[in-house]
């Protein structure tokens, strides 16, 4: 198994792009695709690893046969602990090891292509601006997203961000918008802290809002998500009366 094929990023920006692609794939495995990931991690099979690829795909497979491998290898045997602990704890454990692997791969490229102190520091800062996979899986990133977000929970503010769609009834599928100045003053110091922390973050990937992206809000946990992260298109969203994110859907299914 080659963890990424022949693609070799050579600049800080390319390594970071590689990191983000692998990270996005592993987050999908542990969140939106968690049922398939759980099924593939059969404890009866040999040592299995979770791989993230630069194209945002993920894969459960055996480790590389060549020694030493072309790239650092992820942790072995994630399937063995699947049935021996609570699912949430198991996913968190895989997430922690996945974070360690992503850093190992990124700084492997940095060492291989001679990044100097400034390059390594810049790469680390770029990586550190994103929530870890563990934070996303454990829900910490969602909490941070709520703290950082200045999105209002009432329909009037949602309708502002959906004005281009021409209907308040579709406001929950809009792009997140900051609150009005008057609302910020009413909420005092707490709101000021939120402003300092930044914009709305996607509850799945943890990345901040950017222009020309479709977002959707979960009606249960009231978190915002990239449509692409939860596999919802604008056309599909028009026919959803109450949207539930994958995390909320899984909780209701297990209860």
From Swiss-Prot:
Q: Which UniProt keywords apply?
A: Acetylation, Chromatin regulator, Metal-binding, Nucleus, Transcription, Transcription regulation, Zinc, Zinc-finger
Q: Which CDD domains match?
A: PHD_AL_plant
Site positions (Histone H3K4me3 binding): 209, 215, 219, 224
The subcellular location is:
Nucleus
Q: Which residues carry this modification: N-acetylmethionine?
A: 1
Q: What is its main location?
A: nucleus
Q: Lipid metabolism: present as a keyword of the record?
A: no
Which Gene Ontology biological process is one annotated for this entry?
Answer: chromatin organization
Keyword Lipid metabolism in record: no
Annotated Basic and acidic residues bias: 165-178
List the GO molecular function terms.
methylated histone binding; transcription cis-regulatory region binding; zinc ion binding
Q: Which domain of life is it from?
A: Eukaryota
Q: Where does the record place the region Disordered?
A: 145-200
List, alphabetically, the InterPro entries matched. Alfin (IPR045104), Alfin_N (IPR021998), PHD_AL_plant (IPR044104), Zinc_finger_PHD-type_CS (IPR019786), Znf_FYVE_PHD (IPR011011), Znf_PHD (IPR001965), Znf_PHD-finger (IPR019787), Znf_RING/FYVE/PHD (IPR013083)
Q: In which tissues is it expressed?
A: Ubiquitously expressed.
Its GO CC terms?
Answer: nucleus
Q: Where is the composition biased (Acidic residues)?
A: 179-198
In what ranges is there compositional bias, type Low complexity? Answer: 150-160
State the oligomer form and interacting partners: Interacts with H3K4me3 and to a lesser extent with H3K4me2.
Q: Which family does it belong to?
A: Belongs to the Alfin family.
Can you quote the domain comment? The PHD-type zinc finger mediates the binding to H3K4me3.
Stated name of the protein:
PHD finger protein ALFIN-LIKE 4
């Amino acid at each position: 198994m080659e963890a990424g094929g022949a693609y070799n990023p050579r600049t800080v920006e390319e390594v970071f792009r590689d990191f983000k692609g692998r990270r996005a794939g592993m987050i999908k495995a542990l969140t939106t695709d968690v049922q398939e990931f759980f099924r593939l991690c059969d404890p009866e099979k040999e040592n299995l690893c979770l791989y993230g690829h630069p194209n945002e795909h993920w894969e459960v497979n055996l480790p590389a046969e060549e020694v030493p491998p072309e790239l650092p290898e992820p942790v072995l045997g994630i399937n063995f602990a699947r049935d021996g602990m609570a699912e949430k704890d198991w996913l968190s454990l895989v997430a922690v090891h996945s974070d360690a692997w992503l850093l190992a791969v990124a700084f492997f490229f940095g060492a291989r292509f001679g990044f100097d102190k400034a390059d390594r520091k810049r790469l680390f800062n770029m990586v550190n601006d994103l929530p870890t996979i563990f934070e996303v899986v454990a829900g910490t990133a969602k909490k941070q997203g709520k703290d950082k977000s200045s999105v209002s929970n009432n329909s009037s503010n949602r309708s502002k961000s959906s004005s281009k769609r021409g209907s308040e009834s579709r406001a929950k599928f809009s792009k997140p918008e900051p609150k009005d100045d008057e609302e910020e003053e009413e909420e005092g110091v707490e709101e000021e802290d939120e402003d300092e922390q930044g914009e709305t973050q996607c509850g799945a990937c943890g990345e901040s809002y950017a222009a020309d992206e479709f977002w959707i809000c979960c009606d249960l946990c009231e978190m915002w998500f990239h449509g692409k992260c939860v596999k919802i298109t604008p056309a599909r969203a028009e026919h959803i009366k109450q949207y539930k994110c994958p995390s909320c859907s899984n909780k209701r299914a297990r209860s």
